[in-house]
Amino acid sequence: MGWLFYTDGRVQTYADEKAEIARLCTFEGERRKTELVKACKVGSTWYAAAKVTNIDGTPVEDTTYVTDADGSITFAAVFLTRYDDGCWGYKDMEESAGPVESRAPLSLLALLSELKDPDSYAHAWRQRCQDWAAIPDYEEGDKIKLAAPVTLTGGSTCQIVTATHYRRGRQKRRCYRIEETGGLVRLSKASLAGSELLSSAKGAASPVLAEFLAGRN
């Protein structure tokens, strides 16, 4: 399915978006009904867990999902969203179609029904979401070895860095100090996948104090 944009301006805020996602995940036909269980927004993408039940109370039979104990199945849907000339639009995809965007929170994944095929697109998508969630959020002063060298502008590379920050106005922004040069670089979360913590700042002396003492030796 392609993009669908709303030209009536009814979706303008986060609350509007969430309400529309809930509406899109709610449906009742002659045999089945679908309802939203949970929705989370990561960046501009909405991730939704939707539960399907049979109206007559019999267990839902599905080729992709294992039926839950209550007779329902719960699947994930991904909604790409953006604004174009002030109009909100979305493009949706069910997890079994293998969406590219794969940053659904673990709390949402925990609500989903088990999959019958371990080699399915949905299984691979869930694994990518889990891999993303496993990327650590490093603390100020943590020394890190990246899984592979990162190529910087100019052709140089870096692999061992220390988490720090810089300020833009009143905002603190995460960056990393390069071990070899002392220069600062911003790294995407994806580039931290598979990284190794070499030393932790927790319980250590202040980085500022440590630098001061090192200069006196």
Regions inferred by a protein language model and the residue ranges of each:
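Acidic interaction surfaces
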Residues: 2-3, 9, 39, 43, ...
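Negatively charged, low-complexity tracts enriched in Asp/Glu with abundant Ser/Thr
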Residues: 5-43
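Hydrophobic residues embedded in beta-strands of well-ordered beta-sheets
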Residues: 11-12, 22, 46-48, 59, ...
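Short amphipathic alpha-helical segments that mediate assembly, nucleic-acid/protein binding
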Residues: 17-20, 33, 59-61, 73, ...
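Amphipathic, interaction-prone secondary-structure segments
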Residues: 31-81, 150-167
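Intrinsically disordered, low-complexity, charged/polar segments
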Residues: 86-132, 175-217
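Short coil-to-beta transition motif at edge beta-strands of beta-rich domains
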Residues: 135-150
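Basic/aromatic-rich interaction segments and small domains that mediate binding to polyanionic partners
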Residues: 150-190
